[in-house]
């Protein structure tokens, strides 16, 4: 089935004939030509845009832009410069203009052609199978309360009901959003686009998602170099972020910020069952599972269930022969990080009690400060924090160190 070309239905006016038209006749001519072109574009999106359509979309007549620099169509430019003459249009031109709508492809012809094209197109969707041109480029008449940039009709997309000020913008929107024919395909995700520029923008997202910063120790990759630098501290043992109150150090600044809240004593998350409060919402969620008895995380080897994912992860290490924490001095490996920490202290030759009295703090100083300051925290600080002092003191008593 042969399609009607734009040249078959276009009406040409000379400059003299165009000057004889009044404002209403020029508007009628513009609307008919643009509507005809949009009908043909709907059938063949790859059709080249004629020079006449370029001129009409910019508010000029059917001549060159240089000749039309001082004239414009109504509703787009100032119409005060138009001639006041009201000569009649030649009858042959009027008859040709009236016949244009008869030569424009009918809705039945468009539907048949569209159905034939969509059968061979990939990704055909049901909502595009019966979409006549009037539905695609439906022009809603303006009301008194409606405003527009071009003081003309509004063009509404039938598929998504978006409204546009001119027909060319509607056509671009349809090609980009609803058109079935999309020749540009992404090699990585097979997503298709009508415009090549859209494909280029989409491909940049794939390049940004590639993790190009890789750790030389464990091979883990990251999006940003700052994330890699923070990760490398876990291998070197460097903890640059230290709490000024308890001297506890952290790898990440976010961990230090979260830790400081524990000193403030703020616990905004309260359990409704037992009224116990927590500083983090995640801890409250773990606690609430104790009341419900919910244990959704089950070990596949021993069928033991846990209430939190981290508990299951720690439990799985006991089943495996993997010892991820290795001592750099003697290459001995351990299941748990706390075991490695306790082992490394043996290489330094420092006992638990010596750790506590590193700053020449004795048990008498500890008890004396408690009596002077009462229940408050002592004013001096330790190298390993108060909790380490209590733990070391108890171990020294059990081992006969005092």
Swiss-Prot record:
It is found in: Nucleus. Belongs to the krueppel C2H2-type zinc-finger protein family. One of its GO terms (cellular component) is nucleoplasm. A zinc finger (C2H2-type) spans 155-178, 184-206, 213-235, 241-263, 269-291, 297-319, 325-347. PROSITE patterns: KRAB (PS50805), ZINC_FINGER_C2H2_1 (PS00028), ZINC_FINGER_C2H2_2 (PS50157). One of its GO terms (biological process) is negative regulation of single stranded viral RNA replication via double stranded DNA intermediate. Transcription factor specifically required to repress retrotransposons in embryonic stem cells. Recognizes and binds retroviral DNA sequences from a large subset of mammalian retroviruses and retroelements and repress their expression by recruiting a repressive complex containing TRIM28/KAP1. Keywords: Metal-binding, Nucleus, Repeat, Repressor, Transcription, Transcription regulation, Zinc, Zinc-finger. Residues 125-139 have a biased composition (Basic residues). SUPFAM superfamilies: beta-beta-alpha zinc fingers, KRAB domain (Kruppel-associated box). Residues 118-139 are annotated as: Disordered. This is Zinc finger protein 809. One of its GO terms (molecular function) is zinc ion binding. Disulfide bonds: none annotated. It holds the Pfam family zf-C2H2. It comes from the Eukaryota. Residues 4-75 form the KRAB domain. InterPro entries: KRAB, KRAB_dom_sf, Znf_C2H2_sf, Znf_C2H2_type.
């Amino acid at each position: 089935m042969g399609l009607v070309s734009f040249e078959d239905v276009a009406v040409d006016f000379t400059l003299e004939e165009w000057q004889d038209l009044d404002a209403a006749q020029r508007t009628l001519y513009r609307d008919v030509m643009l509507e005809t072109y949009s009908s043909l574009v709907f059938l063949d999106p790859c059709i080249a845009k004629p020079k006449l359509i370029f001129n009409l979309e910019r508010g000029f007549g059917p001549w060159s832009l240089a000749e039309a620099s001082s004239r414009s169509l109504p509703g787009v430019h100032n119409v005060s410069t138009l001639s006041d003459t009201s000569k009649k249009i030649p009858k042959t031109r009027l008859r040709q203009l009236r016949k244009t709508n008869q030569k424009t492809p009918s809705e039945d012809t468009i539907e048949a052609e569209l159905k034939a094209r969509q059968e061979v197109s990939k990704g055909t969707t049901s909502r595009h199978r019966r979409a006549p041109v009037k539905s695609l480029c439906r022009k809603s008449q303006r009301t008194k309360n409606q405003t527009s940039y071009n003081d003309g009709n509004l063009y509404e997309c039938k598929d998504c009901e978006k409204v546009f000020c001119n027909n060319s913008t509607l056509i671009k929107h349809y090609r980009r959003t609803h058109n079935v024919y999309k020749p540009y395909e992404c090699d990585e995700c097979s997503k298709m686009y009508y415009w090549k520029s859209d494909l280029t923008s989409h491909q940049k997202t794939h390049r940004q998602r590639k993790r190009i910063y890789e750790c030389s120790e464990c091979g883990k990759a990251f999006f940003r170099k700052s994330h890699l630098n923070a990760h490398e501290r876990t291998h070197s043992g460097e903890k640059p972020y230290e709490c000024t109150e308890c001297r506890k150090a952290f790898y990440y600044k976010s961990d230090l910020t979260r830790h400081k809240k524990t000193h403030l004593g703020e616990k905004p998350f309260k359990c409704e069952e037992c009224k116990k409060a927590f500083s983090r919402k995640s801890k409250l969620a773990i606690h609430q599972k104790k009341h419900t008895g919910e244990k959704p995380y089950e070990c596949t080897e021993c069928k033991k269930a846990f209430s939190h994912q981290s508990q299951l992860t720690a439990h799985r290490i006991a089943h495996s022969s993997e010892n991820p924490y290795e001592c750099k001095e003697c290459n001995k490996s351990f299941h748990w990080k706390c075991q490695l920490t306790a082992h490394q202290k043996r290489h330094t030759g420092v006992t638990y009690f010596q750790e506590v009295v590193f700053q020449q703090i004795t048990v008498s100083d500890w008890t004396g400060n408690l009596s002077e300051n009462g229940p408050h925290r002592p004013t001096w600080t330790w190298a390993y924090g108060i909790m380490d002092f209590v733990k070391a003191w108890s171990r020294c008593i059990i081992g006969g160190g005092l």
